[in-house]
Amino acid sequence: MMRGEFGEASSLSRSPSSPLQTEPHPQSPKFYRNHYVFSGDHSSYNSSSRFCLRSPSDYSLSSYFSNGLCSSEDGSSQFASPPLDGLMTKYNFGGDDLGLCESFDLLNVGEEDKTHHQTQRSSFGNYEANGDGGFRYYSGFGVDQKDHQISNSWNLGMQSCNMNNYSVPVHGKSGVGALFDHQGISSNPNESLPKVSEFQGYVYFMAKDQHGCRFLQWIFEDGSALDALVIFSEVIPHVVELMMDPFGNYLMQKLLDVCNEEQRTQIILMVTSEPGQLIRISLNAYGTRVVQRLVESIKTRKQISLVKSALRPGFLNLIRDLNGNHVIQRCLQCLSTEDNEFIFEDATKFCIDIATHRHGCCVLQKCIAYSSGLQREKLVTEISRNSLFLAQDPYGNYAVQFVLELRDFSAIAAMLAQLKGHYVELSMQKFSSHMVERCLTHCPESRPQIVRELISVPHFDILIQDPYANFVIQAALAVTKGSLHATLVEVIRPHSILRNNPYCKRIFSRNLLKN
């Protein structure tokens, strides 16, 4: 069952090993519809550890969790209210569903309390992207909750935390409808919110929850230094796991932005404590974001050295991975040429493997662009030496084209020597034909040799009708001049009968055949 999803009680089983389950609260209220259950994955390491609410006796209501004060409309929050459908009263809230009990009598709430609409309440509601951490403040909840009537302890086995001290009214809002009204979010920066110290011991669990994670990020922005220190001290043992968590990774990115150099070094020491650990994080869809942010933020020689040493053993895996290649690119962007030496050396060593890979070919071009001097010369020379093979590869041909555009004359000379005598076969292949066109447009010195090879074909009519070679001939007609252009036109004209062929139409256009 997905997180925050409700179903029949018979479809789930309680996991006795879950650290988050609690014994039934002695004063738990009874629900009419006891066949509904709530289950959610809330384990620290084992996804099979679960907590679930299976019966009325298990509902130890919290004044800001179980009574719908912590509710997720899409069911994505692990801290969720009881089922939204069918478990709430209708007479007091104008049809809005919040997941409350059907009858206030079951909660031991008096008549005066039922109609008391001005009681101030706070809730941990759906977070909006406005930096409020997901906390909303409302008046007119409709139920004056009493500490002796409803347990104030968390339903997840957490300690009691009375939220009533932090309630701030939102004027003009009343009823349960305000809880889901985005306009009901308080924007007053002076309002007092719960302190992280009140959640001490549970920051790790909050970091893995969608709304809890956002609240913790808000603390880094507007909370006290003590609160930020509490968060850091509680997440530092779990940084590896949180970096690869769908929600925790955002907290780790924020932490790297706001922490000091000593704390950043602590984080780096944690993620590099085991061989291959930083590589594993970099290959993860969520972890790669945090490692990229880490690379952006490192400043000291110790930090840079630790990161380089941890990444180098997995260089080839990283550069060919959908997620990992972005870490290498971020190193190229953020580190100095000297610090990227290990990247340039390994890129030269594994040049063919990288150039012929979907992701690797892109990173190889970035390596050439960010390198200089001897480092660039080695990379370009390696590509030039293998240009004939690379030109025919779906991805390698891009590396050859990139070198051609650099206008490095020694590299181009070596490349043209490799390609000489193969222009016809290269022109008739899908990938290498692009490279021949690029030679014609960027290397004037290559044009005579290419044209001579093309017109020397015994059956030139086959060449101009080829789905790929016809583009090479068009490019040759467009860039050649003088006697070379005239020679090419003389060879083409006798085949004018083919002018209606779909591949020959542009070749026989008036503009291209002009002398």
Swiss-Prot record:
| Species assigned in the record | Arabidopsis thaliana
Please cite one Gene Ontology biological process associated with this protein. regulation of translation
Q: What is its main location?
A: plastid
- GO MF term list: RNA binding
Protein name as it appears in the record: Putative pumilio homolog 8, chloroplastic
Name the UniProt key words of this record, in alphabetical order.
Chloroplast, Cytoplasm, Plastid, Repeat, RNA-binding, Transit peptide, Translation regulation
Enumerate the CDD domains for this protein: Pumilio
Q: Which SUPFAM superfamilies match?
A: ARM repeat
- The annotated transit peptide is positioned at 1-70
Write down the InterPro entries for this protein, in alphabetical order.
ARM-like (IPR011989), ARM-type_fold (IPR016024), PUM-HD (IPR033133), Pumilio_RNA-bd (IPR033712), Pumilio_RNA-bd_rpt (IPR001313)
SMART domains under this entry? Pumilio
Which Gene Ontology cellular component terms are annotated?
Answer: chloroplast; cytoplasm
Q: What is known of its domains?
A: The pumilio repeats mediate the association with RNA by packing together to form a right-handed superhelix that approximates a half donut. The number as well as the specific sequence of the repeats determine the specificity for target mRNAs.
The task this protein performs is described as:
Sequence-specific RNA-binding protein that regulates translation and mRNA stability by binding the 3'-UTR of target mRNAs.
Pumilio repeat boundaries on the chain: 198-233, 234-269, 270-308, 310-345, 346-381, 382-417, 418-456, 457-490
Pfam name, any one: PUF
Feature: compositional bias, Low complexity: 10-20
Q: What is the lineage of its organism?
A: Eukaryota, Viridiplantae, Streptophyta, Embryophyta, Tracheophyta
- Where does this protein reside within or beyond the cell? Plastid, Chloroplast; Cytoplasm
Which superkingdom does the taxonomy of this entry point to?
Eukaryota
Residue ranges constituting the PUM-HD domain according to the UniProt record: 174-515
Residue ranges of the region described as Disordered: 1-33
